[in-house]
From Swiss-Prot:
<keyword id="KW-0812">Transmembrane</keyword>
<dbReference type="InterPro" id="IPR017972">
    <property type="entry name" value="Cyt_P450_CS"/>
</dbReference>
<dbReference type="Pfam" id="PF00067">
    <property type="entry name" value="p450"/>
</dbReference>
<keyword id="KW-0472">Membrane</keyword>
<dbReference type="InterPro" id="IPR002402">
    <property type="entry name" value="Cyt_P450_E_grp-II"/>
</dbReference>
<keyword id="KW-1133">Transmembrane helix</keyword>
<comment type="function">
    <text>Together with an NADPH cytochrome P450 the enzyme system catalyzes the terminal hydroxylation as the first step in the assimilation of alkanes and fatty acids.</text>
</comment>
<dbReference type="InterPro" id="IPR001128">
    <property type="entry name" value="Cyt_P450"/>
</dbReference>
<dbReference type="InterPro" id="IPR002974">
    <property type="entry name" value="Cyt_P450_E_CYP52_ascomycetes"/>
</dbReference>
<protein>
    <recommendedName>
        <fullName>Cytochrome P450 52A4</fullName>
        <ecNumber>1.14.14.-</ecNumber>
    </recommendedName>
</protein>
<keyword id="KW-0408">Iron</keyword>
<dbReference type="GO" id="GO:0005506">
    <property type="term" value="F:iron ion binding"/>
</dbReference>
<comment type="similarity">
    <text>Belongs to the cytochrome P450 family.</text>
</comment>
<dbReference type="GO" id="GO:0016020">
    <property type="term" value="C:membrane"/>
</dbReference>
<dbReference type="GO" id="GO:0016712">
    <property type="term" value="F:oxidoreductase activity, acting on paired donors, with incorporation or reduction of molecular oxygen, reduced flavin or flavoprotein as one donor, and incorporation of one atom of oxygen"/>
</dbReference>
<keyword id="KW-0503">Monooxygenase</keyword>
<keyword id="KW-0560">Oxidoreductase</keyword>
Length: 538
């Protein structure tokens, strides 16, 4: 290399080096320098992993020059207005899929973190099943701990395996099949529907009360009886239990609050309001009442108890009050909210699709009768599974409105995802240890490349079409892989039973013509309708 060339380079570089030596300690130079250096090292590390794993650069990357500060603020804005899920679907189905063909994976920044967002069924399969050990729950345990503690919904690794082994027997077929336990609660629900006298009312609010009543009875051995109120001339038999009246509202508030904490990722602790902490204390106080009641019983007493109570069965395995409370609340989140949301969306769609409603009603009446001729004793776990159109309606409600529309995992090691890189998006992409990977099932379920141009339309008939029966990982309403929902059959059975009983008793279902559609969606830990399911039923 000529000496003159080196001399010329030094002449050019030396002033810059001297400038940085003099000014590097100044914050307005130091901070940008650190950020640029970290960004350069991050890019270098990514390139190394791509070389190591024979991966390709991301096809899609959403630029955010605010280092990911604007993105969560924008998401919070849409969430506050009940349109964050609608926004997510529009972004995927109207931007990335259209501009980049069949690419369903994108890189973005949230609070300075480089995050991968995907709706690709192959990537979802890898995250949840084939590469299960490469991913963990990340910060989920941290931001949910104050409410749910250490339970199956929040734990990873050995703790999760122990929880699952302890809980799996509680969802055996004989427990799931006990639909008759629902009937007393359904009878109270009927009173509320009749009270409306054909006028518009919010059935979602009733469904959430119904499922908290049935879930607390199944789990705790005593219902909060939130449906039994003065408006129908009833009073709860459990009114003296501490925290009973406030429990449902406190549980709802704490979950909604946690959904905002989720958007802040590792900065979740910024949101820690007094009402949030008060709500958690109310929830724990109610749960502790029943835990102490169970622990006051001897092993012999527990064996003598009539009927099935989830808490009593767990108390045979452990006498630790915190373990019992944590597991109960973890199951309550999944069991209560998913069923209430499913029923709400199903009846919201049935009320605006009269042809579907009449067809479903006909199937139910033919199999189980109606009104005074209703053969309630014939509605069993087995007979519900034979109702093909009912199953199609439930499947379609879960497709258009999955209970958990958006979720995430964190890489436990340097790894890959099978698709999202290269010019066509079909090559593997590198994932760094500690990197967040989000998957939006709602957008997958509404992908026109998978479900056709009517992917956003509630159409149960699609479940009788051959191509829909081969969806694989393009339909995952209850997650999949080792962490597949233990209580999915419980939720499906309860939702089906309640649907059958309502359509046996009430033969007209409508909604106001000016009802907003698509509806505004609220995503706390599970999906629900922002404005309720306002219908007329008589």
């Amino acid at each position: 290399m000529p000496v003159s060339f080196v001399h010329n380079v030094l002449e050019v570089v030396t002033p810059y080096v001297e400038y940085y030596q003099e000014n590097l300690t100044k914050w307005y130079i130091l901070i940008p320098t650190i950020l640029l250096t970290l960004n350069f090292l991050s890019i270098l590390h990514t390139k190394y992993l791509e070389y190591k794993f024979n991966a390709k650069p991301l096809t899609n990357f959403a630029q955010d020059y605010s280092f990911g500060v604007i993105t969560p603020l924008m998401l919070m804005y849409f969430k506050w207005h009940g349109t964050v899920m609608e926004f997510a679907c529009n972004v995927w189905n109207n931007k990335f899929l259209v501009l980049n063909g069949n690419v369903r994976t994108v890189g973005l920044r949230i609070m300075g973190l480089n995050i991968i967002e995907t709706t690709d069924p192959e990537n979802v399969k890898a995250i949840l099943a084939t590469q299960f050990n490469d991913f963990s729950l990340g910060t989920r345990h941290d931001f949910l701990y104050s409410l749910l503690g250490d339970g199956i919904f929040t734990l990873d690794g050995a703790g999760w395996k122990h929880s699952r082994a302890m809980l799996r027997p509680q969802f055996a077929r004989e427990q799931v099949a006990h639909v008759k336990l629902l009937e007393p609660h359904v009878q109270v629900l009927f009173k509320h529907v009749r009270k409306s006298q054909g006028k518009t009312f919010d059935i979602q609010e009733l469904f959430f009360r119904l499922t908290v009543d049935s879930s607390t009875e199944f789990l705790f051995g005593g219902s909060v009886e939130s449906l039994r109120d003065a408006s129908i001339g009833m009073t709860p038999s459990t009114k003296n239990i501490a925290g009973r009246e406030e429990f449902a509202d406190a549980f709802n508030y704490s979950q909604t609050y946690n959904a905002y904490r989720f958007l802040l990722q590792q900065f979740y602790w910024i949101l820690n309001g007094s009402k949030f902490n008060k709500s958690i204390k109310t929830v724990h106080k109610f749960a502790d009442f029943y835990v102490q009641k169970a622990l006051s019983l001897t092993e012999a007493d527990l064996e003598k108890q009539e009927g099935y109570v989830f808490l009593y069965e767990l108390a045979k395995q452990t006498r630790d009050p915190k373990v019992l409370r944590d597991q109960l609340l973890n199951i309550l989140v999944a069991g209560r909210d998913t069923t209430a949301g499913l029923l709400s969306f199903l009846f919201f769609e049935l009320s605006r699709n009269p042809t579907v409603f009449e067809k479903l009603k006909e199937e139910i009446h033919n199999r189980f009768g109606a009104k005074e001729d209703a053969r309630v004793e014939e509605i069993t776990f087995e007979s519900l599974k034979l109702c093909e159109y009912l199953k199609a309606c439930v499947n379609e409600a879960l497709r258009v409105y999955p209970s958990v529309p958006h979720n995430f995992r964190v890489a436990t090691r340097n790894t890959t995802l099978p698709r999202g890189g290269g010019k066509d998006g079909m090559s593997p992409i590198a994932i760094k240890k500690g990197q967040n990977v989000m998957y939006t099932i709602l957008a997958t379920h509404r992908d026109p490349n998978i479900y056709g141009e009517d992917a956003n339309v509630f159409r149960p008939e699609r479940w009788f079409e051959p191509e829909t029966r081969k969806l694989g990982w393009a339909y995952v309403p209850f997650n999949g892989g080792p962490r597949i929902c233990l209580g999915q059959q419980f939720a499906l059975t309860e939702a089906s039973y309640v649907t059958v009983r309502l359509l046996q008793e009430f033969h007209t279902l409508t909604q106001d013509a000016d009802t907003r559609y698509p509806p505004r969606l609220q995503n706390s830990l599970t999906l629900s309708l922002c404005d309720g399911a306002n219908i007329q039923m008589y």
